[in-house]
Amino acid sequence: MNRKLIQNLAETLCRQVKHFNKTETECLIRLFNSLLGEQAERKTTIGVDRAKFRNILHHTFGMTDDMMTDRVCRVIDKDNDGYLSVKEWVEALSVFLRGTLDEKMKYCFEVYDLNGDGYISREEMFQMLKDSLIRQPTEEDPDEGIKDIVEIALKKMDYDHDGRVSYADFEKTVMDENLLLEAFGNCLPDAKSVLAFEQQAFQKHEHCKE
């Protein structure tokens, strides 16, 4: 993709996606093209496949849980075609790198709402938490500890007592206690990963400086 095309695309995207100026958006497009490799030169570019993006989530942003990275990919791949378009890529990084608390809450809730019905149910909490607890083989019911944690989470988050967590419940919980933003699994990069990525993407490239 030549410089003029990148500039035009950056101009369009930075009007549609928050938090990045035109120069930064250009950098992210170049990075996207480098991930595409030879495909970037073709007229019909599909995008970055989920396997490659999962690799970035794992190695660049420290998200190591398979179930979570799969959910993150599904949420970010909005048209569900199995590939990340350049717009989906920039939108994801907008939330990851510079998202407001409100944007991050909406994103995390979507990741945790496994079946997309607008609620986080007991079953969904169990699914997300079951791999995070070390089970003792001697326990009669190895799932008992996870069930206990689910009940504690519901007690803390389910403000309207309907046995599930709505977005309003989740928002109120996180506003009261920010640390509970990623209560059911790591789906955002930590501050160190964000800083390292920004330095790599924006500061080390001359063409990405204003």
From Swiss-Prot:
The residues listed in the UniProt record as binding Ca(2+) 1, with positions renumbered to this chain, are: D77, D79, D81, Y83, E88
Give the knockout phenotype: Knockout mutants show situs invertus but normal formation of Kupffer's vesicle (KV) cilia. However, many of the KV cilia in the mutant beat with an irregular cycle in contrast to the smooth rotary movement in wild-type fish.
- Which Pfam family, any one of them, does this sequence belong to? EF-hand_7
Q: Which residues form the EF-hand domain?
A: 64-99, 100-135, 145-180
The answer, when asked if Repeat is one of the entry's keywords, is yes
- Gene Ontology molecular function, alphabetical: calcium ion binding
* SUPFAM superfamilies, sorted: EF-hand
Q: Which GO terms describe its biological process?
A: cilium movement; outer dynein arm assembly; regulation of signal transduction
Location of this chain's protein in the cell: Cytoplasm, Cytoskeleton, Cilium axoneme; Cell projection, Cilium; Cell projection, Cilium, Flagellum
Q: Which residues bind Ca(2+) 2?
A: D113, N115, D117, Y119, E124
The protein's predominant localisation is cytoplasm
Residues engaged in binding Ca(2+) 3: D158, D160, D162, R164, D169
- GO cellular component terms listed in the entry, alphabetical order: cilium; cytoplasm; cytoskeleton; sperm flagellum
Detail the disulphide connectivity of this chain as listed in its UniProt entry: none
Keyword annotations from UniProtKB, A to Z: Calcium, Cell projection, Cilium, Cytoplasm, Cytoskeleton, Flagellum, Metal-binding, Repeat
Quaternary structure and interacting proteins, as annotated: Component of the outer dynein arm-docking complex along with ODAD1, ODAD2, ODAD3 and ODAD4.
Q: What does this protein do?
A: Component of the outer dynein arm-docking complex (ODA-DC) that mediates outer dynein arms (ODA) binding onto the doublet microtubule. Seems to regulate the assembly of both ODAs and their axonemal docking complex onto ciliary microtubules. Regulates ciliary and flagellar motility and is required for cilia-driven determination of body laterality.
* PANTHER family per UniProt: CALAXIN (PTHR23055:SF60), CALCIUM BINDING PROTEINS (PTHR23055)
What is this protein's name?
Calaxin
Species classification? Eukaryota, Metazoa, Chordata, Craniata, Vertebrata
